[in-house]
Amino acid sequence: METTTKKARSLYIPYAGPVLLEFPLLNKGSAFSVEERRNFNLSGLLPEVVESIEEQAERAWLQYQGFKTEIDKHIYLRNIQDTNETLFYRLVQNHLEEMMPVIYTPTVGAACERFSEIYRRARGVFISYPNRHNMDDILQNVPNHNIKVIVVTDGERILGLGDQGIGGMGIPIGKLSLYTACGGISPAYTLPVVLDVGTNNQQLLNDPLYMGWRHPRITDDEYYAFVDEFIQAVKQRWPDILLQFEDFAQKNAMPLLTRYRDEICSFNDDIQGTAAVTVGTLIAASRAAGSQLSEQKIVFLGAGSAGCGIAEQIIAQTQREGLSEDAARQNVFMVDRFGLLTDRMPNLLPFQAKLVQKCDNLQHWDTENDVLSLLDVVRNVKPDILIGVSGQTGLFTEEIIREMHKHCPRPIVMPLSNPTSRVEATPQDIIVWTEGNALVATGSPFSPVIWKDKVYPIAQCNNAYIFPGIGLGVIASGASRITDEMLMSASETLAKHSPLVNNGEGLVLPALKDIQVVSRAIAFAVGKMAQQQGVAVKTSAEALQQAIDDNFWKPEYRDYRRTSI
């Protein structure tokens, strides 16, 4: 039986003339048909030729190639996004591998630092502390009524760059761009938000161009009351929203997640998304080596909320593979700037306290140091996996990597800190120091390493493999919460798509060109698990798949028809 592609239904539009051309979600530019130009008062406002979206995308690609710096390319793409969103996503879809590092990490870091300097047009919602009592009115000002995904930041811990104030808005904008480009979530359903609670970045406070609230950051009870007002206003406006916390400081990230994950459908991508993609990568790497994650010893450099979130997800996975909780925790070693986390270390945060090693178990270690450094830990633990989430460059030294390789023939080394300027070690150095034997995955994109005439592909342990699929799965299933089991199902699905596992060679993670396929598969796994967990209404597998297909937006123009307001 011959299949036919179902034609998208026409959209009925009340806007016309220049107003329509200024509406990024609806603007087609030179692709408005002759009939649409006549019906929507556009005749004479556009050049004569009616173009297809592919013709527009080809021109945009040529213009893009004319820019020499990554930040200029970023600014150009953001301008298209703020002019014609459908064209923006078609262009990004056509050149995803080239453009993902430009619209998000690492280039978005520079865009956040220069936000007030390169600002051109409003996008998203800025809620400042002085406006805290007007939140309901502010959210009513959002023109898109059917918002389904919000990414919110307070700008305090932007990548590895620290406090960027309202410049942090670049992160929600970039993140939501990937929800659409990778996960097929319509841009009409997305909303970036920055909570402007001031900044402690003196450079910003002294900058005459800075556009945020010029005030030191509010903290403690005032801060949490402000965030709570925001959460309650969001629940009132969009009760079924998916809320993603993004780049909150360590002292606030885990408390906010703990407080709200059972009150509103929410997750923290820095903690849970990073953990899910890292665990998926490690499952795949372990299987490719003919073993399980539960058989590995793992050392972390960085014991903040992200590092501890990854560690807890690893522990949960190794328990699924058969370890007891105590045995699983004994395989994970957390090192921060004060050394190895132990049960005698004072002033640990609650989420760190669960990840300490008992000093009684360390008495046989070969060291004379009271503070156990990363080198001490690597020398005594003899780990199979080394993960960096420190945000500090160069901490995986040659001595440390060579010491690890001395005891592990095929070490897995994951310097995950963003942006590239903060990476713990470069893939080039790791490959050289391990004589080509390391499997390397990074947080930011790196080119393949060539060493002794052999090419070593470098996997990017990018959260974009995970969060777009989670978002699509939540929307398609109608899930009311995001459970740990849903995140673990996302990790398992990602591992199943590993070329290294499936083909015995290649990258440990799928190619970016296949990311929409991966996102769909993760969406199905997440939606199915949501149903099993009782946080979504149970349906057949066919109905869930159909819901995913129905919610997967494609960057294609639809026919417009005129209607009154």
From Swiss-Prot:
Enzyme Commission identifier(s): 1.1.1.38
The keyword Metal-binding belongs to this UniProt entry's keyword annotation: yes
Gene Ontology BP term (one): malate metabolic process
Catalytic class of the enzyme: oxidoreductase
Classification via InterPro entries: Aminoacid_DH-like_N_sf, Malic_enzyme_CS, Malic_N_dom, Malic_N_dom_sf, Malic_NAD-bd, Malic_OxRdtase, NAD(P)-bd_dom_sf, NAD_malic_enz_proteobac
Cofactor note: Divalent metal cations. Prefers magnesium or manganese.
Catalytic function, reaction form: (S)-malate + NAD(+) = pyruvate + CO2 + NADH; oxaloacetate + H(+) = pyruvate + CO2
Residues under site feature: Important for activity: D270
Listed GO MF terms: malate dehydrogenase (decarboxylating) (NAD+) activity; metal ion binding; NAD binding; oxaloacetate decarboxylase activity
Active site, UniProt feature: Y104, K175
Positions bound to NAD(+): R157, D270, N418
Keywords of the record: Metal-binding, NAD, Oxidoreductase
Assembly, per entry: Homotetramer.
NCBIfam families (UniProt xref): PRK13529.1
Protein's name according to its UniProt entry: NAD-dependent malic enzyme
